[in-house]
């Protein structure tokens, strides 16, 4: 059952973790020069079925010091234990504090590619042709 949908509890806890991580990143308390003045969006958090691992999908909205998006994710993973300790204050009701793993969110990039494909002249021509045939 690897492709099973997440439970209601996984979704609820994931959303709580997402808010807590986003709040920590928004405060700018990380002592990493790369992350200090950067805007990072926490797009989604997926919880493991036992709620012990939280995979945080992030999207850096601005990069400084000519850093790549992968560098930002690596820096977040390096500071994941500190972030875990900071979010523990707002998630006291949890029996176990989840291990945080940061991943790059590519959904916006995928959206841009699909949007560019739909706007291409070939697709527009086919759509226009299908509209005429349907009439």
UniProtKB/Swiss-Prot annotation:
GO terms for biological process: maturation of SSU-rRNA. GO terms for cellular component: cytosol. The keyword Cytoplasm applies. It is found in: Cytoplasm. GO terms for molecular function: ribosomal small subunit binding. Keywords: Cytoplasm, Ribosome biogenesis. Belongs to the RbfA family. One of several proteins that assist in the late maturation steps of the functional core of the 30S ribosomal subunit. Associates with free 30S ribosomal subunits (but not with 30S subunits that are part of 70S ribosomes or polysomes). Required for efficient processing of 16S rRNA. May interact with the 5'-terminal helix region of 16S rRNA. NCBIfam families: PRK00521.2-5, rbfA. This is Ribosome-binding factor A. It comes from Bartonella henselae (strain ATCC 49882 / DSM 28221 / CCUG 30454 / Houston 1).
